[in-house]
């Protein structure tokens, strides 16, 4: 399991006191301690190498600026062929009233620079998948893939999509591929040879969304194939 800390894992012991991660969090898991980070981030920010995949877990609740250098170092030093980043708050939020501008301003450029393949988010109680294509030096959009971004929801609490807000991310190069509301999901990610396959299923086990990233490991170029099952 790759636990990702969310906003509900943080609490304050009294009004006006700083929030800290829940006392239930650390006893439940045995997670890496990144000693270069502040103690408040220990066991909530970490990196796991699983076979040929590097998974970087970010704490999107606390000390965001101090994590930026950590993220870049983990990506710069990465020897794995695939890079996945996950945090609770959505980089490209599809829900009304949600906006994680810091991530788009500070983290997305790093994801672009080091070719992150997939970013997995939650928090918004709705579903959206999109991607950022590679652009040429003069800003022209190409058919090559940069990063796939997913925001998903597994619980029964649901919010509505904000299509206008999603459209506003065009200035960041984001292109929506699929979206849904009032639906619970779980995802399966499979890596085999030069392909990463992402599939979203409804709570009833029906396939809803599929994306395949195909990568040329020599050039680093990637292509995206999307299938909207519904």
Which residue stretches match the model-derived regions?
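Short, catalytically relevant binding-site loops at active-site mouths
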Residues: 91-92, 125-127
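Extended active-site neighborhood of metal-dependent phosphoesterases/phosphodiesterases
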Residues: 1-79, 106, 128-180, 185-188
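Active-site-proximal segments of metal-dependent phosphoesterases and phosphodiesterases across multiple
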Residues: 78-119, 139-142, 168-169
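Hydrophobic anchor at the start of a short beta-strand
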Residues: 1, 83, 196
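Catalytic-core region of carbohydrate-active enzymes that cleave or remodel glycosidic bonds
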Residues: 1, 108-122, 126, 183
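Active-site glycine-centered loops adjacent to acidic/histidine catalytic or metal-binding residues
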Residues: 6-7, 88, 122-123
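Extracytoplasmic low-complexity repetitive segments enriched in small/polar residues
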Residues: 67-68, 119, 208-210
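A short C-terminal boundary segment appended to hydrolase-like catalytic domains
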Residues: 160-162, 167-230
